[in-house]
């Protein structure tokens, strides 16, 4: 049977008062990504042709944060309940397409669970996602007859037998566009809150003799929402543990899964080791036998085989060749490219520069807008002076160059192959091949020197 086209509605208009934040609730992040972005991505994975994003509070902020998302922005000017929210998108529904209703503050719903829900949807009926809770207090109970859902009874309206039911409503549901439009038009607001509830569709479907089936989520965390920062932290830790468990099963040695954060994607080789408190952001690729020390932050980097990144190093938008050694306390800024067998040591910062094979930059050095050849030694305290207050300039260093400690290279400047620069030198002109350059003043010895005495 040919599958129906699919569109998604994501409810994301809530303010999130209990977050105590100026940021709309659904923009708070899980694993480095706004909660609603997780839901949008899942809808895309499902193959949704249209994603209708219902927004309200903080609309300008929402549009700014999600400017690149392929969604249909649907404004809910007043928040009058879940059915009212979906009503705002109903004019965009096609009669013969399936519509799945999702929630922007429930970010962990999976493609696999939603596929089961969509497959279970009866013709002209509703498929409802439910979950079994050990403590269902406060949730709407699922009432079944002959396996079908005939009602959702709220806590305050439930009798003693109904209160013992563990199966509860999640709010996630699927029906076709024509049915949604028909039932949404009939939803009333005759309740204490004066709001329009999506749960009323269950009773309306049963009135029309349309089947309502329930599919149970196997993991309660899939449907958990975050209304406050405590719940947000619980979702974060759950997802991080899930991601760490997957990596462990793939052969990555994560020394403490509870102290590992993946806020993007990680592609890895064999025998990778990751110590505690490491943060992975953006898209990171690690080769075979890479070792990441404690407290490192890696963002959008490619790391070759047999590289060791020692503790508390920060790498961003950089490339590191095989058998290199980085850190501890190194910083690679965007545009840093290190060839194979390079060494970058403690308190070294490299930005928008290339370092050739086998070269060493081991201590207390800044390299910016530079090209360093192979087999060079850059001493402690070397500075490439790349900025004149208005523009950046390049420093180009050839192969087999030795740069002594406390040297300043005032760009634009070139140092040819084999040159040696003495410690304490300031380079302002190009250096020729195999030259020795020293600019420091001659050392003087003054006998009988008397240091100044403090005045009392």
From Swiss-Prot:
GO terms for MF: glucosamine-1-phosphate N-acetyltransferase activity; magnesium ion binding; UDP-N-acetylglucosamine diphosphorylase activity
Positions with a binding annotation for acetyl-CoA: 380, 386-387, 405, 423, 440
CDD domains according to UniProt: GT2_GlmU_N_bac, LbH_GlmU_C
UniProt-annotated binding residues for Mg(2+): 105, 227
Top-rank EC class of the record's enzyme: transferase
Active site (record annotation): 363 (proton acceptor)
Protein's recorded name: Bifunctional protein GlmU
Organism name: Haemophilus influenzae (strain PittEE)
Gene: glmU
